[in-house]
Amino acid sequence: MLMAPQGRSSSKKRMGLNRWKRFTRKPSPQHAFGPDNVEHWIKRVEKASEFAVSNAFFTRNSDLPRSPWGQITDWKTSEQIEDHDEIYAEAQELVNDWLDSKLKQELASDEEGDAKNTVSSVSLVPEANDHLKYDKFDDLCGYLEEEEESTTVQKFIDHLLHKNVVDSAVMEDLGRKENQDKKQQKDPRLTMEMRHKQVKENRLRREKELEYQRIQKTLKKSAFLEAQCLVQEEKKRKALEAKKEEEEIQREMVKLRREIIERRRTVKEAWKIEKKRQEENSQNSSEKLMFQSTHILLDEEKMAKERKRKLKELLIQIFKENQQCQKRYFSAWHKLILDHRIKLGKAGTLSDWKIQLKVLRAWRDYTRSQKLQRETQALENDLREENRKQQLAAEHNRKQVLRHCFTEWQHWCGAELLKRELALTKEENRKKMDALLKAASLGKLSASESSGISLPEEATAVVGPPVRNGQVTAVPPLWEKPPLGSSDCMLSPPLGRTTGNLQGSLQNVPLSAPGNKQHKTLGVEPPQLPGSNETLRTTSQKAEPLCLGHFHSRHVFQQQLIEKQKKKLQEQQKTILELKKNQRLAEAQWAAEHASAVTDTQSHLLSKPRGEEEPRTCQMLVNSPVASPGTEGSRSDSRNCLSGRKRKPKQLMTPHPILKAMEERAIQRAERRRILAEKKKKQEEEKLAQLKAQEEERQKREAEEKEAQLERKREEKRLKKMKELEKQKRIKRNQQLEAIAKEHYEGVLLRKKGLEPWKILRMQSKQNVQVAEEHYCLFLQRKYLLTWFQCSQESLARKMAQADQFYSQILLKRVIRSWLQYMTDLQEEVRKFCVRFLQKKIFRAWFNMVREVKIDSRGKHEIAAEHSDRRILWITFRTWKKFVKFMKEERVKEERRQQLRRKVVEILPDFQVPGSDHELYQQSDTWSLSKTSLL
C-alpha cells in the first residue's frame, strides 16, 4: 500500500528535475544531418549532456530526501531559466564560430575531393539521425563507438580504393589492352545508397504525417480553446448581468428600506404630537366640563342653524347639478339626432351619385363598343383589300415567271436545234475530209481532183459565211475528238489556249444578221449565250420589284419596270459592242496564228520527205476549225504543192541550189513572220487583259450601282414604315386627346348643370329640416320637462333624507374603525420597540465577544509566525548539512562531462572548450541549485 505513493512521488521528482529540459530545449524540425553539418554536432553534444545529467540525477535520486528536491522543483524562478538560456546561447555561439572557421579552411583545401566523396557522404546522411533513437546513455555511447569504427573502416577502404598500386606507365600499357573488353564492376555502395534513400524518404514521410497530425491536433485544440473562451466570456457576461441585476435589486431594497424608515419616523413624530395634544386636552378637559353645560344650548342652536344653512346650500348645489346634467343629456341627444340625419343625407347623396356613375359608365361602354365595331369593320375591309391586292400581285408575278421561263425554254430549244445542225454539218465535213485524205493517201487524188476540190469548197462555204459577216455560229468544244479515218492520218484537236480564247469570245457574240435564213434562226440564241447566270440574275431582278409591288400602286410599278428594262437594253447594247470588239481581236489573232502555222508546215515540207509531210498537212488541214477568207489561197497553194510533188518526185529528191536558197529565204521569212506574229500576239494579249480589267471594273460598278439602288429602296421602305408608324401614333394621340376632351366636357356638364343645383337644393332642404326639428324639440321640452322636473324634485328630497341618515351611520362606523386601528397600531409599536431593544442588547454582547476573539487570534498568529521562522531555519540548516553530498554528486557529473568532452574531442580533434566559459557555466549551475535549496 505504501509503494504506490512512493512511486508517484519519485515520478514527480523526476518530472521536477527534468523540467529545465523543457525550458532550455528549443523545438526544431528534424532535418537530414550530414557529417559536416554544424547543427548535427551541436545536437549530439546537447543529447550527450542531457543523458549525462539525467543519468547522474536518476542514480542519486533515491539517496536524496524528498522535501528539499520538491522545494527545488517548486521554487525554480524565471531568473534561473534566463541565466541558463544565456549560458547555453554563449556556448552554442562558440561552437558555431569554431566550426565555421574549421569548415572554411577544409572547404578551401578540399574543393576537388568533394565530388569524389559525395557517395560516401550520402551514405552517412541517414546514419546521422540514428542517435535520436536511443533513450539511454550507455546505448548512445555504444552507438558512438560503432559509428567511429565504421568511419575509420570507411576511411581505410577509401584510402585503399584511391591508392595507386601500379605505375602510370604500366597503367597506360594495361589501359590500352583493357579498354577493349573493359567492364564496369558493380559497386555495393550504390545499393546501400538507394536503401538509405528509401529509408530517408520513409522517415520524411512519417515525419510529414506526424507533423500533419500535430497540426490537426493543434487546430482542434485551438478551436476547442476558442470555444471554451467564448463559453467563458458568455458565462462572465451572464454573471456580470446577474451581478448588475442583483446590485440594482439591492439598491431598490435600500431605497425601499429608507422610505419605510422615513415613514415610520414621520408616524412616530405624529404619534408623539398626538400624545402631547391628548395630554394637553386631558388637562384642559377638567376646565371645559365646568363651562360645558352653559354652552350646550348655544351650540345646539348654532348647530341647527348651521344644518339649515348647509341643507339650503346642498339643495342649491343639487339643483345646479341637475340643470347641468339635463343640459348634457339633451345636448348629447340633439347631437345624436343631427348625426343620424347627416348620415342619412350622405347615404342618399352617395346612392344618387352611384346611380349617375353607373349611367355614365354604361353610356361610355356603349360608345366605346360602337367605336370598336366601326374600327374593326374598317380594319377588316383594309385587310380584305390588302389580301385581294396581294393575291393579284402574286398571280401577276406567277404569270410573269411562267412567261419568262417559257421564253427561256424556247431559246434553249432553238440553241439545241442549232447545235444539232452544226454537229451534223461537222460530221459531214469530217466524212468528206476523211474521204479526201484517204484518196490522197491512196493516190486517187488525180481521179477525184474535182471532187477533192469541191469538198473543201463546200466546207469553206459552210463555215465561211458567218466569218465573213463578222459573226460566228458555234465552235466545237475542246473535248470533242474527230473520228479516226486511218492509222496514217491522226486528227488532233485545236490548240488549247488560242482556240479556248476564241471559243469563249465567240460564244459571247450575239448573232443577228438580217437577210439570211440561217442567221434568222441563229438570232434566237443571244439571250442564252451570256449564260444561265444572267438569266437567273434577270429573273431575280424582276422578282424583287414584283415583291415590292404589293405595297405600291400598279402604275408606279409599271413605270419602274419600264425604266429597268431601258437600263437593261442599254447594258446589253454595251455588252454587244464589247463582244464585237473581242471577236475582231480574236479573228486577227486566229489569222496570225494560222499564217504562222502555214509557214511552219511549208518549212517542214521542204525539209522533210514526202512520207512525213502528208499526214502533217492533213492534220493541219483538219485542225483548222474555222476557215477565214484570207486562208483560202494558202489552202489552194498547199493543194497545188501536193499535186506538184506527186507529179515530180524525182525533182524533190535532188533539189537545185537555187531552190535551197529560196527555201532558206522562205524559212527566214517564216521566222520573221513568226516573230511578228508573236509580237502581235503579245500586244493582243495585253489588249485582252486591259479589256478584261475594264470589263471587271464595269461589272464592279454595276454591282455597286445595284447595291446603291437596293439600299435606296430599303431606305425608302424604312422611311415609309416610319411615316406609317408616325401616322398611327398621331391617330392614337388624337384619339386619346378626343377621349380626354370628351370626359372633361361630360364632367363640366355634370358639374355645372347637374350636381351644383342639386347640391343647392339639398342644402336648402337640410336647413328647413333642421329648423323644423329645433322647433319640435322646444315644444317637446316645454311639454314634458315640467312634469319631469316636479317628479325629480320629489325624488330628490326623498333621496336627501335617506342620504343624511346613511351619512350618519357611515360616520359612526368610521369612528369605531379608526379607534380599533389606533389600538392595534399602539400594540404593534410596543412590540417593535421591544424587539429593537433586545437587538441592541444582543449586538452589544456579540461585539464584545468578537473583539476578544480578534485579540486571541492576533496573539496566536504571532506565535505561528515565530514557529514558521524557526522551522525555516531548521530546514535551511538541514539542507546545508546535505550540501556536502550534493557537491559530491556535482563532482561525479563533472567527471561525466569531462568524459563526454573527451569523446567529442576524439570525434573532433581540433575542438577545445575555453576553461573560463566552462567554469562560469558550472558556477551558474551550482549557484542556481544552491539558491533553490536555500529557498
From Swiss-Prot:
Positions in coiled-coil regions: 189-324, 366-438, 554-589, 660-740
Keywords: Coiled coil
Entry keyword Coiled coil: yes
Superkingdom classification of source: Eukaryota
Region annotation Disordered: where it falls in the sequence: 596-661, 678-715
Protein name: Coiled-coil domain-containing protein 191
Gene this chain is encoded by: CCDC191
